[in-house]
Structures are given as C-alpha cells and as structure tokens.
Amino acid sequence: MSQSGKNGLTYSDAGVDIDAGNLLVEKIKPAVRSTRRPGADGEIGGFGGLFDLKAAGFTDPVLVAANDGVGTKLKIAIDADYHDTVGIDLVAMCVNDLVVQGAEPLFFLDYFATGKLDPDQGAAIVGGIAAGCREAGCALIGGETAEMPGMYSSGDYDLAGFAVGAAERGKLLPSGDIAEGDVILGLASSGVHSNGFSLVRKIVELSGLDWDSPAPFTEDKKLGEALLEPTRIYVKPLLKAIRETGAIKALAHITGGGFPENIPRVLPKHLAAEIDLATVKVPPVFSWLAKTGGVEAKEMLRTFNCGVGMIAVVAGENVATVSAALEAEGETVITLGRMIAREEGAAGTVYKGTLAI
C-alpha cells in the first residue's frame, strides 16, 4: 500500500535533508565571495558558473583543464574530525597541474558527496576550498553537494575538484627547447601532500599510534593534524617566475608515482632526468614513515614526494635568476639534478647519491 496524505513519506524520511543543504549554501556564501577575481563576480546558486576571459585580460587564450581528488587522506580527516584543510588539498591537486602547463588558474568547481549532510562540517570543507582558491588566485564559481544516504557510512564523505586555467597561445609549457645539460630545480613540499595515504594509514596502524597521539616527527602537533598538513600551492610563485624570467622550460608536479612517474611526463623521449638524491632535504615525516614501516628508498621515491613537490627545468645560465625569483616568493629551492641523454627504452629518471632517510 502506498503512503499518502499526512502520513506520506518525505524526502527527509529517505535521508535527504533539503533544509540542511540550504543552510550549507548560506553558510558558505561569504567564503565563495572571497574568491572573486576579474572575470568572475557572480553568485553561487545558478545552474552554471560564468567566467569572462576577456575581463581576465586574455587576448588569444588556450584553456587548460584538470580534475583530481584528495584520496584516502580524507579518511584521516574523517577519523581525526579535522576538516578545515582538505579543501586546500583539493584545490592544490588541481591547480598545481594547471601551472605546470604554464596556465593561470581561473576558476574552480567542487563535488562534495556524503551520506548525511552536516552543514558545519560542510562549511569547514568548503572554507578550505575557498582558502585554496584565494591562494591560487582562482574563483570558486560553483559546485555540487550530494547527500546520498546508503552510499556512504556515517560521517564519511568524498571530494572531487575541477579547475580550468588559461595561457596565451604560444606560452604553454613544456617548451620545445629542453636540452641535455639543463638543470632541474626542486621546490620543497609542505609534507606528504595528497598521495600515498593508503600506505601512510597502514604504517600508522602498525605503529600502534592513534590520530590524537603526539606526532613523533614534529613538536606540538597531534599525529592526525600533522599528517593533514595541506598540499603546497605553487601557482603564484611559479607564474611570477615564468613571467619575470621567461626562463622556465618545464615544470612537473610530483604527485603519485614520485620522481620516476612524473618527471618523464614533461620530457622529450631522448632525454632523462638525472636526480642527485643527496641534495634532497627529506622532511622528518618521511624518515618516520620509512623507518616505522620498513619502507625501502625505492618504494618511498615512487610513492611519495619525499620533500620535493615540484620541479622546474632551466638552462644552466638561468639557475640563479629563476631560483632567486622563486625564493623571493617564499619557495625553498634546491639544485636537484640535470638533463642527460636517454637511450631508446631506457628509464626517464635515473638516480645518483643516496636519499637521507
């Protein structure tokens, strides 16, 4: 028998709270407004977000798009009940992929899915997304919040991000003049960033620690909070260095797969990256993970950034100029390696020296 009249079912009875969704929208409006930039000044709530390329100052742009997630780092945020920074990670994973192609991030959209919507939790997450957008200089022009009872366990959620940027035609990276002898610069990471967290969680499980335990690799932080250090956003320093020096030939975002998977993606087939591992200043978190989990250096290098979240390829004569431009914007820069000749079928990344873990 169907339900009808005053005893009929409602959407809320099925586990979807429209009022909670509306409350979330009101809570996040100030955060969203704070991300406005030339080209985007609309309000959220429409069927689609708008962006005016001409108002953003482009004349002959090529659009560049990227999407990504945060992975199982979210599980730590959920278990530690700390949701303020995973939105920064979400933005970082997308916009860092745009800037490596020479593109300026313009706008961002998010997808937030949960089994039971908590407006305060959702506002914390979106607040982090807005913070990441401000840091990257892109507008949060829309998104989707999906309350899906039965799809997620209580308290669980997932995030996906979508970013679009632009570069003037002819200004895209990598350039076509990468050459043997060019120097590879490494930009320091802020921590584990957003890759390898399934292994991180397994190591923490083996350690016997919980998320509220003091972090064994840093002072004055709980383990969960320390591991949730947000992914560094390299956009503004890199864009400034690209424009001021004109000397950056290629960039690579060091994410899942580490050096061996990410650096070759931006290199011509006849060149390989020779990385001097002795130059890498490995942050304590990676040393702790390696020792606690008994993880070999080779596995660390293909799972984590190990302290280098971005690399840049420049000609030898431009190392000082590019390094100075990046350091002036707060980046820590090392000379990580150089470009060498690569035989057909050979690896795109080779190592010398020893990783200090």
From Swiss-Prot:
Main localization category: cytoplasm
Pfam families: AIRS (PF00586), AIRS_C (PF02769)
Record pathway: Purine metabolism; IMP biosynthesis via de novo pathway; 5-amino-1-(5-phospho-D-ribosyl)imidazole from N(2)-formyl-N(1)-(5-phospho-D-ribosyl)glycinamide: step 2/2
Keywords from the UniProt entry: ATP-binding, Cytoplasm, Ligase, Nucleotide-binding, Purine biosynthesis
Catalytic activity: 2-formamido-N(1)-(5-O-phospho-beta-D-ribosyl)acetamidine + ATP = 5-amino-1-(5-phospho-beta-D-ribosyl)imidazole + ADP + phosphate + H(+)
BP terms from Gene Ontology: 'de novo' IMP biosynthetic process; adenine biosynthetic process
Record's subcellular location: Cytoplasm
Gene Ontology molecular function: any one: phosphoribosylamine-glycine ligase activity
EC number: 6.3.3.1
Gene Ontology, cellular component aspect: cytosol
UniProt keyword Membrane present: no
EC class of the enzyme, as a word: ligase
Protein family (similarity comment): Belongs to the AIR synthase family.
Family matches, as HAMAP family: AIRS
Protein's UniProt name: Phosphoribosylformylglycinamidine cyclo-ligase
